[in-house]
Design a protein with these regions (language model features):
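Long, contiguous secondary-structure blocks with strong helical propensity
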Residues: 16-17, 80-81, 85, 117
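Residues at or immediately preceding the N-termini of alpha-helices
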Residues: 31, 109-110
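Short beta-strand/loop segment at the start of cytosolic alpha/beta domains
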Residues: 1-21
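A short, charged, amphipathic alpha-helix used as a generic interaction element across diverse proteins
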Residues: 112-118
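Short acidic-hydrophobic, aromatic-tinged amphipathic segments that line or gate anion-handling sites
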Residues: 104-108
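Amphipathic alpha-helical interaction surfaces in cytosolic regulatory modules
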Residues: 25-103
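Conserved catalytic submotifs in the C-terminal HATPase_c
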Residues: 14-15, 54, 110
Length: 118
């Protein structure tokens, strides 16, 4: 699904995990497609959602706010949110906002799955 300059693709990994690959720009305008992707990723009961941000070009404060909104939803539903593929720039932003304390940040999908015990 493409919206503006953001593209999301949902991919099941296992019965307990799914990935959402995000490419392009994440802004507040990305909320509907990202939340729809999350709903599709968890529809079959996945407890771990991995955001693949390797194709992220740009994220503004609205995009950071959207990650917070997603994180609250994930935690409320008893799931875990992880992220992979972050550039050094976006790793630093997540550290400055302390989102890295709530979102598991890993280099690869395999590392994220291992950290989740899958």
């Amino acid at each position: 699904m493409t919206t503006g300059t953001m593209n999301v693709e949902v991919r099941p990994i296992s019965a307990r995990a799914a990935a959402i690959a995000i490419t392009g720009d994440v802004t507040s305008a990305s909320e509907a497609p990202l939340m729809d992707a999350y709903a599709r990723a968890t529809a079959d009961g996945a407890k771990v959602v991995i955001l693949d941000l390797g194709g992220l070009d740009y994220m503004n404060s609205g995009g950071i706010g959207l990650l917070v909104t997603l994180l609250v939803r994930v935690q409320r539903e008893g799931r875990r949110l992880m992220a992979i593929g972050l550039s050094d720039h976006y790793r630093q932003i997540l550290a400055l906002t302390r989102l890295d304390e709530a979102i598991g940040i890993h280099d690869t999908e395999a590392e994220a799955l291992a950290a989740a015990g899958l």
